[in-house]
């Protein structure tokens, strides 16, 4: 109620510093002051049909990793009457899970998948502020401009990729009576987990691209080339090496070298001692045939 009366005084003029809410929330109040009336509720704009499907496809990696993380969190929050949400960087709600009665109450306000948490439509809200401020935000009760949200508490934290770019946000919503002290920190933990997973996927994809480029170059050389991992499993063999050693280029991938070939003693010793070999003559045995090669 104190914030409600503060809002009314703000409409009439200005608020003394002692009566202002947190700076980010107060700045939002100032932006909303000339845009809306607190008592009038305006349902959020909602992306539907092909538009919403296109947004979800564009955010497929965020959704895939986010859904797994949020579902795991919900599994251990069965007694909590709250919702966990995934939003894109524009504030469009892509997916949510959690308490069904709470979800139905939120749907009555127009918050369904595709709804935009835009400050210009619904007033001060945590997801919009989290994206704008770039850090976790919580907006509770009468800190919301719209009176329809005064019974609600929302927390949100942006999700960042390894380049520091916002990829979306994670939000938690519940009735004001059901909020808990750890709600904001929970969204922070989930957002960081999802961000780390996005970064790992990105690094893996980049490594695979570089590896494919390397393999493409090796495919074109005249010499036979093989590569294996620390366990002795074949990771790569080009067409020239497969032909020389009488191996199937595709079927040999991922198999132990010892299953494919009888390695020369000199090569086995060099592998065991981690010693390089340069232009040495060795003989492989493959399919009961001896194959003389010059090895580096």
Features from the language model and the residues they span:
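Non-catalytic regulatory/interaction regions at protein termini and inter-domain linkers
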Residues: 1-54, 61, 100
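Regulatory sensory and allosteric helical modules in signal-transduction proteins
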Residues: 50-79, 84, 88-142
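Sensory modules in modular signal-transduction proteins
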Residues: 66-85, 200-242
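Short loop/turn motifs at secondary-structure junctions and domain boundaries
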Residues: 75-79, 146-152, 217-219, 272-273
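PAS-family sensory domains
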Residues: 93-126, 188, 222-276
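PAS-family sensory/regulatory modules and their coupling/dimerization elements
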Residues: 142-143, 151-156, 256-296
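Amphipathic alpha-helical "output/dimerization" segments
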Residues: 179-193
């Amino acid at each position: 109620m104190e914030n409600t009366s503060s809002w009314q005084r703000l409409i009439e003029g200005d608020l003394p510093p002692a009566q202002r809410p947190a700076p980010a929330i107060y700045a939002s109040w100032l932006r909303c002051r000339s845009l809306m009336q607190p008592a009038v509720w305006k349902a959020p704009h909602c992306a539907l049909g092909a538009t919403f499907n296109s947004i979800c496809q564009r955010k497929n990696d965020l959704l895939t990793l986010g859904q797994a993380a949020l579902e795991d969190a919900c599994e251990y929050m069965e007694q909590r009457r709250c919702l966990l949400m995934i939003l894109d960087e524009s504030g469009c709600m892509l997916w949510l899970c959690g308490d069904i009665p709470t979800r139905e109450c939120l749907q009555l306000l127009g918050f369904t998948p595709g709804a935009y948490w835009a400050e210009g439509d619904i007033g001060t809200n945590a997801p919009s502020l989290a994206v704008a401020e770039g850090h976790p935000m919580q907006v509770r009760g009468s800190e919301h401009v719209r009176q329809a949200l005064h019974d609600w508490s929302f927390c949100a934290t942006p999700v960042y990729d390894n380049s520091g770019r916002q990829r979306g946000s994670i939000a938690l919503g519940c009735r004001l009576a059901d909020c808990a002290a750890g709600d904001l920190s929970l969204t922070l933990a989930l957002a960081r987990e999802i961000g780390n997973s996005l970064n790992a996927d990105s690094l893996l994809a980049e490594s695979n691209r570089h590896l494919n480029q390397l393999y493409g170059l090796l495919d074109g050389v005249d010499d036979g080339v093989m590569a294996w991992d620390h366990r002795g499993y074949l990771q790569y063999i080009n067409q020239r090496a497969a032909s020389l050693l009488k191996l199937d280029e595709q079927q040999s991938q991922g198999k132990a070298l010892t299953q494919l070939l009888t390695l020369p003693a000199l090569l086995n010793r060099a592998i065991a001692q981690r010693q390089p070999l340069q232009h040495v003559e060795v003989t492989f045995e493959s399919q009961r045939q001896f194959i003389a090669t010059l090895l580096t």
